Amino acid sequence: MMTKIYRAGTLKRIRRTDAQLEQLDAQIFAVLKEDHPQSVLHVFYRMTDPRLPEPVEKSDKGYRHVQDRCVKLRRSGRVKYNWFADLSRRGYFTNTYSSAADFVTSVAGLYRADLWRDADTRCEVWSESRSIASVILNDCKKLAVDLYPCGGFSSLSFIHEAATSINNSGDVRPLQVFYIGDYDPAGVLIDKSLERELREHLRSRVELRFERIGINAGQIEQYGLPTKPRKESDKRSLHIGCAVEAESLPAKTLRGILRDKVEALLPENALAVAKVAEESELQQLELMARMFATPWPLDDDEADAADDE
């Protein structure tokens, strides 16, 4: 069965009434409450479902409308800001601490046990866009895998830096890379270019295993993903007859696919074992912080010097 290709309609959309806007807002709220964080583009694709009471059109105009409602929902306080994922803008900070105890307390929460110590492979996740990366970031953190957003065709320096990190690690286990990107004439070339460049820079002893886990042709049919006609001017990948953005796959589904793939590489009960180890080590770090916070007793000479002052 062929997936239907949606083309821009010719009918002019009538301005929504207050009741229709309220219904659209309710739909957006429900989607985000059920699963977050999501990018605005993920929410937009959910709002194009014709089965909804108030769907939006599959067009740039429809996206801008959803984007506008998402802004209003955040500003009104109806939707939490952190329900939206956005890695496109980040600040750069220098952390400072009031004391050694403050430092130990602050960094204790960053401690992670090595989930991959006894695994047969290493694992990384690459995504075509920061939009996708922002949605899967928390899962990558929980699973202790590095995440690299390409931003389209990735820069050679970015790939070289990632490969150099692998080469310098001293880890001789195979490297599994999972990739997520758009299925369109350009998108199906990005992961091929990435894999080729990684192989170019990785040392020969590093066995690279590369798998595109989304979006692929089978998923378009399996999940009934909305498609767009390919640009007639684009002469790349002529065997690709349509365009499907990675964000058209519901964020919850995408995260589930990723977790299943990554967890299959981990030893049995690795997450549970690591959690127990982390709790024990965190207790030691907390004890260390208390030791730094407690003034050390002065010896006799130090006490006399303090009295003289």
Report residues per predicted region.
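Catalytic metal-binding/acid-base residues of hydrolase active sites
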Residues: D184
